[in-house]
Amino acid sequence: DFIGIEGELFTTKVGAQCIRVDKFTFLSKTLRPLPLPKVDEDGKVHDAFNDAELRYRMRYVDLTVNQNVKDTFIKRTKLFTAMRGYFNDAGYLEVDTPVLQSIPGGASARPFITHHNSLDIPLYMRIANELYLKRLIVGGFEGVYEFSRNFRNEGMDRTHNPEFTAMEIYVAYKDYNWMMEFAEGLLEHCAIAVNGTSEVTFGEHQINFKAPYARVTMTDSIKHFTGFDISGKTEEELFAAAKGMGIEVDETMGKGKLIDEIFGAKCEGNYIQPTFITDYPKEMSPLCKEHRDNPDLTERFELMVCGKEIANAYSELNDPIDQRERFEDQMRLAAKGDDEANGIIDEDFLRALEYGMPPTSGMGIGMDRLIMYLTNNASIQEVLLFPQMRPEKKQTIELSEEEKLIVALLKANENKMDLAQLKVTAALSGKKWDAATKGLSKNNLIKVSVDGESKVMELVE
């Protein structure tokens, strides 16, 4: 229970701070006991609230009894505060962009679809906010960022949740080389703000976010770990190579998807310390500027940590003609059956580019995955206050013979009976009657109401 106390603060002879109570006030009643863990004299913990499913479903209990869980979410807030301060100190503007969008752009992902009744049109939950932020660069802002809730109707695992938090930032008159240096400074700053040091422990690994980070091209990475050079290869050659490596691929995959599958299966997991993978093939990056030295590549990097991507950045494509061709390539992939390809051309975004967008670099960071590394949590569910879960199944209730008798009598009388008459008809001893009705009430199967001068028991539907 919650009790308010009024009194005088004093210090005991042994130095303990105490209150000499003058008045108690009852504030709130608790109907359920907390599952408080107990530590025995040998240091063993008993009755710990550590069942993962129960913890995620009842986070309010988890936060109350497990201090380490509360500490994780305090650090999560520190991360957002530190990152926001870093951007604000650089003079960049925090903005808000739509969650409901008419075209699901800015990423290759399957969207959630909903319907706007008033406008009678389909809308999509945001998969990314990239195209709206670029519109703001066109509008004259030189640096904008947003912490956004994004939604992708895809699989769930220890590092993916259908609803997640991303940060995206766009800065005019910069390129991806500048953004790599900016990212190094940002992540070192955030690690120190959250943990007091740039070094963190994640599982068996010691990760150091201190700048600078290693840089490896996508082509060199794949060649190093597989011996296969992706340069200049056709879609058929990439398909055959992936099959030969034992990678599961299908006919709907284009060149970009095939290269992505090869890198993900054979290379990605080898990068433990922060490493920039740079210069992606053009087919993998429909919104990225062509590489200044090689027209087959793009000026893009992904930052890998412990075998997973935590940041993705480009020198942004600002040529509306080139951008239209990339969108058309995406449409061809969508028609071929790639459900992650965007099958809709965003004409308004192309129109914005036609008004002119300065050279710009943009970066997105997966905030949930980043805080996993900074708090040594291997599961994304541990860093989300209320992770997505299947609906809770109703527990099967085993009834005693006496409880079954009462239920049967109620059902035979249209689910309700006079309480006194029911008790006589059931012919149970006082002890068995009390136990049976208490059990049925506890499981919310019956309720008793007053009808005039008599009491009525009825089944709860």
Name these PLM-found stretches.
Residues D1-T396:
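Class II aminoacyl-tRNA synthetase catalytic cores and aaRS-like
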Residues A16, K416, S454-V456:
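A generic structural signal for beta-strand entry/edge sites
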Residues G85, A240, A408, K438-G439:
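Surface-exposed charge patches
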Residues G106-A107, K442, L459-V460:
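Short Asp/Glu-rich motifs
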Residues T396-E403, V450-E461:
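Short, cationic-aromatic polyanion-contact patches
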Residues E398-A426, A435:
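Short amphipathic alpha-helical interface segments
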Residues L428-K442:
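Short amphipathic alpha-helical interaction segments
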Residues S441-D451:
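A short, conserved structural fragment
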